[in-house]
Design a protein with these regions (language model features):
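Alpha-helix-loop-beta-strand connector modules within alpha/beta enzyme cores
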Residues: 1-17, 36-39, 43-66, 94-121, ...
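Glycine-rich loop at the start of a catalytic domain that most often binds anionic cofactors/ligands
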Residues: 1-5, 26-31
């Protein structure tokens, strides 16, 4: 029921469930984001093929911390990559090694050299002042939670992020 309500109010948005493909498919989400310890992208696609109607759009994102993680995800048919963490964050418990700006530059360059055109979103400890340098690495976008949740005015902070991202 919650999935149906969300879909009624988010017809122009991607409704993504974190970590659980089965729940994402059952509640009518358009996407699932899989962490490194969740089921594989290929297993999620097998589930999706059984439950989606022909022509129905569904996205499967994968978490990555290295170029090799991206190679693996691309090989399994990932729709996009959540690459991180950018810096330390308390939002995630089992944190992979922090990449920093140089890590993003290196990995994005490796993706270009490999001919990958998969969307890459930076994640992990991102603040408003990080948007410009991160976007300049060639990533597609950012995923933010803590900076907005902990802001004095989360709505205004969201608008600030949107305005900054829209410059790219």
């Amino acid at each position: 029921e919650i999935g149906q309500l969300i879909n009624e109010h988010t017809n122009k948005c991607i409704y993504c469930i974190n970590d659980n493909a089965r729940i994402a498919l059952r509640c009518g989400a358009n996407a699932v984001h899989l962490g490194k310890e969740d089921i594989s992208v290929s297993a999620a696609w097998e589930m999706a093929k059984e439950q989606l109607f022909p022509g129905e759009t569904f996205y499967i994102g994968a978490t990555a911390n290295t170029f090799e993680d991206i190679e693996h995800a691309v090989g399994q048919g990932a729709s996009y990559i959540g690459l991180g963490p950018f810096r330390y964050t308390e939002t995630k418990k089992k944190l992979s090694p922090v990449l920093g700006l140089e890590g993003y530059r290196k990995i994005v360059q490796q993706c270009k050299e490999a001919g990958y055109k998969i969307p890459i979103f930076a994640i992990g400890g991102i603040c408003l002042e990080d948007v410009t340098p991160l976007m300049e690495t060639g990533i597609t976008g950012i995923a933010v939670s803590g900076a907005i949740i902990h802001a004095e005015d989360p709505v205004e902070e969201t608008h600030r992020f949107i305005n900054e991202i829209n410059k790219y």
